[in-house]
Design a protein with these regions (language model features):
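Metal-ion/cofactor- or nucleotide/acyl-coenzyme-handling active-site neighborhoods
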Residues: 2-452
Length: 452
């Protein structure tokens, strides 16, 4: 009897040992599987977006890690088209159509830094990481300096700006998320039902359509600045993969496709371009077959009735000619009240530092117009990269650092606020020239500073 009990005890011990061993093997397998799933996925850089080659600066094909939040990622799915076709016919344009607008810029035309000293491409190199951080610091310092020098009480106030903080000293407005501030500015185009346009013949010129078609299908948008640092960037293919591509004024694509792409969905144009004869807004091919969003600031507290009779530049005459010439065109006017609400967001972001009492630039207006419609916006060369060369535009040879760092528009405040909204890594922004902004969740926003 004792021998039987001993045999049974031995069998139980053996079975228990087998169970423990099996459990250990299962746990070990799970750990290996989890580690495999946690293995970071390599994201290609700019060169790979353009050439589809996964080889970095030092010739290494396989790299063990990646920098987080990289803008550049290619989904290798043979069933997907890499280049997304435009829903609009491409604009036929040329840099020879017209000279660039005459803007008020500073006399300081020289760069105060040497960007080439910070240029690198190996995002896994510690040296490149350090160079990128140093360049970022120099750029931010330059913007901060420009902001500190941008305003004094003796400067003219042609737009009669009389800003009062929403909450005075009792609330730190600058702590509110920047993306929410931009969204809540509500930059919009005027509609036929808006007063006083619902009762005047001019209002019938406004298109009945919405600003963008098929909004539910819009996933990614690119805003292409006109910066001189786009020259030689080879970002054209990357730009053209986006569902919506926004450009400004008369910035051409023809002859610059490798750097800026060929696709154009919408152009944001200022009232100078609409008005001045050298731009030939009503007839130039560059303004056809694309959506147009034209803007003029008007006075800070002026009414729309005042704006109709005293716009900065009388864009209404040429707008009417354009709409009557092309009745099926999608040409809109941006609400000037919303432009000044956007200026208020910049002042909120700046806090106790006063910014220039001039309207935001077309670039910042374009961002605010696009962000509510697009989950992800890539802003190309708005924040200068190490390709910074001092040129105003990629299509001209004019040299003036004020085009980048600001002198009339509150450009420094705009770019610091845009950097605050950025979700891409520093390598993407300061080496490759791509800043990424994601549309905020509605639950994050909703404070409604402006009460409109």
């Amino acid at each position: 009897m004792w021998q039987v009990k001993r045999a049974l005890s031995g069998q139980c011990q053996t079975l228990l040992g087998v169970l423990l061993l099996s459990a250990a093997l299962i746990i070990h397998s799970a750990q290996i599987g989890g580690a495999a799933k946690a293995q970071p996925r390599l994201e290609p850089g700019v060169g790979e977006v353009n050439s589809a080659e996964a080889v970095n600066e030092n010739g290494r094909g396989n790299v063990a890690r990646r920098l987080p939040r990289s803008v550049f990622h290619v989904r290798w799915n043979p069933n997907e088209k890499f280049v997304v076709e435009s829903r609009e016919s491409p604009a036929i344009n040329s840099s020879k159509l017209a000279p660039h607008p005459r803007l008020k810029v500073s006399k300081n035309t020289k760069l105060t830094l040497s960007p080439k000293l910070y240029l690198c491409h190996d995002k896994y190199s510690e040296l490149c990481h350090n160079k990128t951080q140093q360049f970022r610091q120099r750029i931010v310092q330059t913007f901060e300096k420009s902001m500190s020098e941008s305003f004094n009480d003796s400067q003219p106030n042609p737009y009669h700006v009389d800003y009062k903080p929403v909450f005075g000293d009792s609330f730190e407005e600058q702590y509110y998320p920047s993306t929410c501030l931009v969204m809540e500015a509500g930059v919009r185009v005027l509609r036929r039902k808006d007063k006083p346009f619902d009762k005047v013949p001019f209002g019938r010129l406004f298109p009945r359509q919405k600003l963008f078609r098929n909004i539910k299908n819009i996933k990614t948008c690119a805003i292409v600045s006109s910066a001189g640092s786009l020259a030689g960037s080879k970002l054209g293919r990357f730009i053209d993969t986006h569902d919506i591509v926004m450009r400004f004024n008369h910035a051409p694509t023809q002859g610059h496709e490798v750097d800026v792409g060929s696709k154009t969905t919408i152009r944001v144009v200022n009232s100078q371009v609409v008005t001045k004869p050298e731009f030939d807004f009503a007839h130039a091919p560059i303004f056809r077959n694309v959506t147009i969003a034209a803007w003029d600031p008007g006075k800070y507290n002026g009414t729309l009735e005042d704006w109709l009779t005293s716009a900065d530049y009388d864009l209404f005459s040429n707008y009417e000619i354009y709409r009557r010439r092309y009745p099926k065109s999608r040409a809109f006017l941006i609400d000037p009240h919303s432009v000044w609400r956007l200026w208020q967001t910049l002042q909120m972001f700046a806090g106790n530092r006063s910014i220039r009492r001039n309207p935001p630039s077309s670039g910042f207006i374009g961002l605010a117009l696009l962000l509510p419609h697009c989950p992800q916006v890539d802003f190309v060369e708005y924040i200068p990269s190490t390709r910074l060369n001092g040129r105003c535009h990629y299509y001209s040879k004019e040299m003036n650092a004020a085009c980048t760092f600001g002198s009339w528009h509150p450009l420094a405040a705009e770019k610091l606020m845009t950097l605050d909204m950025n979700t891409a890594d520093d390598m993407s922004v300061f080496q490759f020239g791509i800043l990424r902004i994601r549309r905020p969740d509605k639950l994050l926003c909703g404070f409604n500073f402006f009460g409109y």
